[in-house]
Amino acid sequence: MENVVIIDGIRTPMGRSKGGAFRQVRAEDLSAHLMKKLFKRNPAIQQHEIDDIYWGCVQQTLEQGFNIARNAALLADIPHSVPAVTVNRLCGSSMQALHDGARMIMTGEANVTLIGGVEHMGHVPMTHGVDFHPKMSLSVAKAAGVMGLTAEMLAKIHHISREMQDEFALRSHQRATQATQSGAFANEISPIYGHDADGILKRFDYDEVIRSDANLKDLAALRPVFDPVTGSVTAGSSSALSDGASAMLITSESYAKNLGLKPRARIRSMAAVGCDPSIMGYGPVPATQMALKKAGLVLGDIGVIELNEAFAAQSLACLKGLNLLDSMDDKVNLNGGAIALGHPLGCSGARITTTLLNLMERRDVQFGLATMCIGLGQGIATIIERMD
């Protein structure tokens, strides 16, 4: 079976969904921008050599409908001969796109795939047009469809206090602020034009969602939003609503060698699992365990971890379940996470994998893990290995 290598990964800045930078930029344009940029950064790979495009997106309607992968590819002037498909595993969609593209290469069906994802949550809200089957409640708790209530459940089961959640949320903003100021995001962000608060067109090369002024006092003052009476999950300890896209170029190792490319990492293992929808946020735990088993590794072998922060309560429950609380500050979400950057659903999987790749290079570690929870009870994980 062919080894799959990552040639490059980039993302857009994360724009605030409510009146943010991309309020006049469409999801297809965010996607096409990255498709074009990847080939400018990697001119040795010709666009006509792409065997397929896999693009994650959750709300496939309005501007994100009718196969946004193909629409974006056409906007990016990618040759018409290159096919494209939109992938939906909810929050894990662009990581699933990575897995789908990788499997095509592993089986010899492809040499090069372009993968990524997008979500414009300002233009296409998360619940737009959603209509759950009435009989679903016969087998699944009604509250399982409300992500914030699943986080509340995890907080209760794993004894995650309000104070722990607020501290974790603050850490996310502080880490993301430090990463921005130090230039840690520079290699992964592909600047793009949007509009500032005054409606003036400007070039954005930073994430506008991060709150550099976040503090515990303000976080503690927020009221629980999902369970106002006995809850502890607030807007401040939940992932921000944001708009963004991410993209990666992956190839077979033999193709990269023949073309004289210098791959940045090798995909060691991939895993997707199911779990109880009522505790959907715990999915990264069994997904990580499965990915480690497939890779023949133990968690101690992993030098850097990107865990998508859907909620602080959910993230802390996973870290507790993986025995990572004590090593969190040395390994996990070192540049902050979705609480600070936001969680554009179809974008996040490839986004955290790209951030992971850059962190591994900066910290000179061999193995890295990207993992995330998925609404309605799933988890997904990818382990990558740096290449010299």
UniProtKB/Swiss-Prot annotation:
Its main location: cytoplasm. It is found in: Cytoplasm. Pfam families: Thiolase_C (PF02803), Thiolase_N (PF00108). It is an enzyme of class 2 (transferase). It catalyses: an acyl-CoA + acetyl-CoA = a 3-oxoacyl-CoA + CoA. Its EC number is 2.3.1.16. This is 3-ketoacyl-CoA thiolase. It comes from Photorhabdus laumondii subsp. laumondii (strain DSM 15139 / CIP 105565 / TT01).
